[in-house]
């Protein structure tokens, strides 16, 4: 019995030792783990200093200047060529347009363009340049520091002035009520305009001519008819030359002109200034230029300067 018990204990001892040895052989010594690599930053690197600056202007100054001008007979053209000294030497390649709106559209849609329009017709679609350092404004037109300016005139024959309705409308345009229509767009040539009393007249007036004066005349018309509802006023364009010629012939009761009458025209017509207006030199809004000398304006419109990079 004792011998059997000893044998059993010996066997158990062997089994325990075998298990212990097997566990030691199968145990894996953990390998030294490498230090974790820091995760790459997901934030966007700060841009280089030069990328924070505004982009350089990409306006190509090597391009040819596209010159836009008004037609012969336009009061705006006459005032412009006389004041700048362009005279009869308008650039042969200049694109001739027959109205203010056409000039505005031409300059708005062509980055290389330059043109001129009435200050009262300016819009945000184009950029007006300072001339010799002076921008067109009510103040600079009144004090004369802005050189490109001219009067807005209505012209009538002596015969038409005798017409009661014609005279009443003329009186209205020169009155305080009429001059209020200039707003901040045009400058009044009258220091102390008189008040206007509605006449109660009726009838139809035909007024036509300068497309520069036309926007102001539309305002005058609306204000006058509000006070005299039995009056109709028909307004047409065509340019200052048309207004002068048709007023002379009697086709119009009142002509509109944005240039002074010539001596031969004064024989048949009386001119009356209803406002002062500047002529703005305009470029495309993409053009980096903000000012120009009057001499440079002349050189461009005579064709002496043909590229933007020739302007100092």
Language-model segments: what does each one mean?
Residues 1-9:
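Positively charged n-region of N-terminal signal peptides that target proteins for export
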Residues 4, 22-312:
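Exported/periplasmic ABC-transporter solute-binding proteins
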């Amino acid at each position: 019995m004792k011998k059997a018990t000893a044998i059993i204990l010996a066997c158990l001892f062997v089994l325990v030792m075998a298990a212990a040895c097997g566990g030691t052989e199968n145990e894996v010594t953990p390998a030294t783990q490498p230090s974790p690599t820091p995760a790459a930053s997901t934030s966007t690197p700060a841009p280089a200093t030069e990328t924070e600056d505004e982009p350089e202007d990409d306006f190509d100054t090597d391009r040819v200047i596209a010159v836009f001008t008004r037609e012969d007979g336009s009061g705006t053209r006459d005032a412009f060529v006389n004041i700048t000294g362009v005279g009869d030497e308008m650039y042969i390649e200049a694109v001739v347009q027959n109205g203010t709106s056409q000039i505005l559209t031409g300059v708005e849609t062509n980055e290389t363009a330059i043109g001129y329009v009435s200050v009262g017709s300016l819009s945000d679609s184009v950029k007006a340049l300072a001339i010799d350092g002076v921008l067109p404004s009510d103040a600079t037109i009144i004090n004369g520091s802005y050189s490109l300016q001219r009067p807005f005139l209505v012209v009538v024959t002596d015969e038409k002035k005798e017409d009661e309705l014609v005279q009443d409308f003329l009186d209205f345009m020169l009155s305080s009520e009429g001059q209020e229509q200039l707003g901040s767009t045009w400058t009044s040539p009258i220091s102390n305009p008189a008040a206007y009393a509605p006449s109660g007249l009726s009838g139809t007036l035909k007024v036509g001519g300068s497309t520069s004066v036309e926007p102001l005349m539309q305002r005058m018309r609306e204000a006058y008819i509000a006070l005299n509802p039995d009056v109709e006023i028909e307004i047409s364009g065509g340019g200052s030359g048309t207004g002068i010629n048709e007023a002379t012939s009697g086709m119009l009761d009142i002509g509109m002109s944005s240039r002074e009458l010539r001596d031969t025209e004064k024989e048949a017509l009386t001119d009356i200034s209803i406002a002062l207006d500047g002529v703005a030199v305009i470029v495309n809004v993409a053009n980096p230029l903000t000012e120009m000398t009057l001499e440079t304006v002349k050189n461009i419109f005579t064709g002496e300067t043909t590229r933007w990079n020739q302007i100092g």
